[in-house]
């Protein structure tokens, strides 16, 4: 008899009677949900009713129970509204964080300057013309539909239509790429597909969390496969001190930092850490139990904040305000595994709650008057002196001027910048690999790593903030060796290969403030012209004229890096 035959016979012998007998042994069965928030429906959140939305809902009786019949068009209306509001308004706790940084006597000048700029940017974005950030993100929807909520079953389609409307009819950027084969890609042209996670729950209401997640902060979500050895105060603190530095500044601090210890699987850990960064689990209990419930740990949240403040990284250019706040959540785990998740919500901090009930559609009330958070502090107390840099001169003259100042110096750029990011760099390298020279425009002006949102009528530019510098690190030495990219401008820290290349070739990396894309478009960018690869959309090469464009010298021509100590 084969092993397979033996297995089959064994399976036949296990009948319903055996299962019933086994179940009887578990007389003390106890079900306990892992997540037990005290405010699961976010009643502490202020919601505003969408005017006239009651016409999209109807109560019906089914088998003696009250069900909610929802016209699926309500999903389209809600998604459109959510992904419009979230690009122009912020939660109050986020705005309060910037205000604290401005008023804190322990904050650095750079902390206060960055926080003030971000608050001013919020004021411009609140005009509902320019989005707060040029990277208007991947659209993510978490939906929990009650078992007695009927929509017709095509929820993903109707939610996607609302997202499509938001990105089509507002000044938002299309960032999603479709894979044509393993290597060829194209922009989808509408920012779809969205990520839609829809769940069934008891009741008749339909609850939502809408998130617009940009690439910078999404790329700072980390999974670490640890062991029981991590679970003691000394080891955990050392782990936090090490890993917080790896977040760097590329995702635009001050951050909302989330740390999750444990998880029944890696994917559970990472989903929890993303939602924690959105403050979705704020009402979890603060103690665990023998059944494995999730809980927040306020003591370790304080420790994470202490480590963040003492790191010296600050709000991008040194200081205290690396983070607004922290969330630390402990989960159950398999005895052989200890997954740990680390993630952030960045300065764009775009998430918004909503729900549909028998009265209509309700959406979280974000703050529409951010100007009230700007303190009455003279500008002289908010920033250090800036150095004016005229970019209309030959690039060698600009390099000579920058060489006179130490890293950390704030500069104001005036003149021409060339804008090129990931795909443009890849195409230029491909041209060079095929024997073509480095384009002349890469040699005559600083290179700004960015990609604009759509330009509103009457504006010179759409929101146009920097993208993460690190993704272009591999090109710097090559391009500088061919006489180009001597001065680059973007956000975040860079690798040692960039520092080495700048020292070798006499180059500089200037750090732009990550986050205030609207204020740059309104106040600093005066003209935008497409130079090359127009078919790439926002990934094309652009020529822009700027006035008083703020930046900091991060890497100089002597091999100095302003982050060398804080991120070491």
Swiss-Prot record:
One of its GO terms (molecular function) is fumarate hydratase activity. Its cofactor is [4Fe-4S] cluster. SUPFAM superfamilies: FumA C-terminal domain-like. Specifically and competitively inhibited by 2-thiomalate, which coordinates with the catalytic [4Fe-4S] cluster. Weakly inhibited by malonate. GO terms for cellular component: ciliary plasm; cytoplasm; cytosol; glycosome. (S)-malate 1 binds at residues 134-135, 173, 216, 421, 467-471, 491. It is found in: Cytoplasm, Cytosol. Binds 1 [4Fe-4S] cluster per subunit. Optimum pH is 9. Cytosolic fumarate hydratase that catalyzes the reversible hydration of fumarate to (S)-malate. Homodimer. This is Fumarate hydratase 2. It comes from Leishmania major.
